[in-house]
Amino acid sequence: MIISVKEIKKFIICVLIPILIGYLSFLISTLISQTSFEIQYLQLIKPDFAPSSDVFQIVWPILYVLMGISYYIVIKSQKSTQKIKEASFFYYLQLALNFLWSVLFFGFNLRFVALVEIFILMLILMAMIYTFFNVNVKAALLNVPYLIWITYAMVLNYFIWILNK
């Protein structure tokens, strides 16, 4: 199977978009708060099950790559345009919410607002996985680790909010 340069570019763009959005969210959060993510995270009172800040720097890039690959699979599928549009809507909506969470939590220190927002993100992510499933099962399954991580992050967000009131 020969893959065109155009397809390789499309794949790379699909993978880079979530990575860049994630990077920008942490950059903007740092600019707003004038403190890096690592320093803020270290200063928080956290529950015993909270990971070290290094874990986030490993997990998020992996999740962003999986998101990008899954979206590429969706847009390359032979399913109806309507199904792809619906999946794309939820994909970009969850990316926007993903971006916003870091700004709320780290940029503005709005822990409770971030908690509400991550709950909405989790619901939108479930809708995205469902719409991806209707297009391509593998694309949907690639996002299950993301859903698990977001659920964990939501629980962590809750306890950090409670412990740091």
Question: Where on the chain are the PLM-derived regions?
Answer:
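Terminal transmembrane helical module of multi-pass membrane proteins
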Residues: 131-165
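Interfacial helix-start motif at the membrane-water boundary
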Residues: 47-65
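Membrane-interface helix-boundary motifs at transmembrane edges
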Residues: 2-6, 75-85, 133-141
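Non-cytosolic membrane-interface motifs at loop->transmembrane helix junctions
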Residues: 107-120, 141-142
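N-terminal signal-anchor transmembrane alpha helix
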Residues: 2-30
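Perimembrane loop-to-helix junctions flanking transmembrane segments
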Residues: 37-50
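Membrane-interface helix caps and helix-loop-helix hairpins in membrane proteins
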Residues: 101-113, 161-165
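Core segments of transmembrane alpha-helices
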Residues: 60-72, 94-97, 121
